[in-house]
C-alpha cells in the first residue's frame, strides 16, 4: 500500500510523551492518538503503553520512536530472527500471526469498503522459496558481507540465518558465504540468488568481472557437493548454466518449467491455495472461455485450462509468453493459447477476443490495471477475479467495475508474506443480472 509524504518536515522538540496503542497498521506500526493527531510508532502493538518521542510531525499525523515500553500486549511474541529490527526484510515478527492477519485484513476492508471473506494462508515460517542476497567486499577486514538491506538504508545486514527462508535455503547460508568468501573474485560479486524448486536448489551468482578458472572450478565443486544447479550471470542479460537442467516446480497438479530469472511466487503453499480458490470462485465450467490477463508464464492460465473449454493468456513480456506456450505443450494442454500484447491498448479488437469470454482473471503488477478495466467491461464476463499485490491500486481499479454494475462477491487477504508489511489480496466480482 503506497504512502506519500511531502518533503517538508516540522521541527520536533524530542519531548517524551506517554501513549496507548489502539491499533496496528498493515505495515506493522502501532497506531496511537496524541493531541488529536494520529501517531505511527514502529515496534508497538495494540494494548501497549509506552514512552515515545516524536521524530516527524506532519499536519495530519506524526511518527514516533519508542523510548521505553511500559506494558506488553498478550499478542507480543519474541522474534525468531536475531536480525529482526535491523534487517529490512521483516517488520512484524514481534506480533502474533493472528494479529498480523487481522490488521492486514482490516486495512484491506477499509480500502475496499467491504468485509474480508477469508484469509488464505499457509505456514508462517520457512515459506520463502526464493531469496536474493546482496554481496559486498570490505577492504579493511578483507571479508565478504552477504545479506539483506537494512531498514531504510542501502547498508547490508550480514545475515547468519533467516527463519522465513525455506529450510533448505537457510541451511545453505553459511556454506554459500564460506564458498563465495574464498573466491579470488570476491571483490567483484554483486549478489547471489537462491531458489528452491521442486526439481532441486538453484544458485545464481552475479559477478561483475570475469571469473578465473580456479574460481569456476571452486564453484563447480561446491555445486556438486551441495547438489545445486549453478548459474553464472556476468550481466543482466546473460545467464550461463554451469550445472543442472531446466528447473521446474509443481503447481496444482501441473509441472511448470521456468528460467532461474523468471518471476515465480515466493510462497509455494499460498500460491497453490490461491490458484485453487481462484478456480473455485470463477466456477469454471467445461464450456467456458476464460481470459487471463497479465498471465506471466501461466500460473493461473494452465490450471484454468484443465477445467475450461478454452483459455487465452495475455502477457506483455515475450519471454514469459514463450515459457507459457512451452509449459502448455509439456503438460499436454491443447486448449490454451498465449499472446504477447501491450495491455495498455484495446485487446478487445484482437481476433482471439471476437468470440468473447465468460470469465476473466487478472493478476497485474503493483501499478494495477487501470488501462484494461474498460476493456474487461466491454467483454461483459459473468465473473472476474482480480489478484492484487497493491491494495491501493486494487481499490482504484475496482471503482470502474462497480460503476459498470459488478459487485464484490468475495474478498480474500492473501498472507503471502508473513511477518512483513506486504499485503496481497484477491477479489471476486460478479455481474448484476
From Swiss-Prot:
**Which keywords has UniProt assigned to this entry?**
4Fe-4S, Iron, Iron-sulfur, Metal-binding, Methyltransferase, rRNA processing, S-adenosyl-L-methionine, Transferase
Sites marked Interaction with RNA: 132, 149
TRAM domain ranges (all copies): 10-68
Any idea which positions bind [4Fe-4S] cluster? 81, 87, 90, 162
Q: Where does S-adenosyl-L-methionine bind?
A: 265, 294, 299, 315, 342, 363
Q: Which reaction does it catalyse?
A: uridine(1939) in 23S rRNA + S-adenosyl-L-methionine = 5-methyluridine(1939) in 23S rRNA + S-adenosyl-L-homocysteine + H(+)
Active site, renumbered: 389 (nucleophile)
GO process terms (BP): rRNA base methylation
Write down the Pfam families for this protein, in alphabetical order.
TRAM (PF01938), tRNA_U5-meth_tr (PF05958)
Q: Which domain of life is it from?
A: Bacteria
Q: What is its EC number?
A: 2.1.1.190
EC class of the enzyme, as a word = transferase
| Interaction with RNA: region residues | 23-40, 58-63
- MF-aspect GO terms: 4 iron, 4 sulfur cluster binding; iron ion binding; RNA binding; rRNA (uridine-C5-)-methyltransferase activity
Q: Which PANTHER family match?
A: 23S RRNA (URACIL(1939)-C(5))-METHYLTRANSFERASE RLMD, RNA M5U METHYLTRANSFERASE
Q: Look up the further comments and give them.
A: The function of the iron-sulfur cluster remains unclear. It may be involved in the correct folding of the protein or may have a role in RNA binding.
Record text about domains: Contains three structural domains: an N-terminal TRAM domain, a central domain containing an iron-sulfur cluster, and a C-terminal domain that displays the typical SAM-dependent methyltransferase fold.
- Which protein family is named in the record? Belongs to the class I-like SAM-binding methyltransferase superfamily. RNA M5U methyltransferase family. RlmD subfamily.
The protein's matches in HAMAP family, at most eight in alphabetical order, are given as: 23SrRNA_methyltr_RlmD (MF_01010)
Q: What does this protein do?
A: Catalyzes the formation of 5-methyl-uridine at position 1939 (m5U1939) in 23S rRNA.
Could you identify this protein by its name?
A: 23S rRNA (uracil(1939)-C(5))-methyltransferase RlmD
Q: Which gene encodes it?
A: rlmD
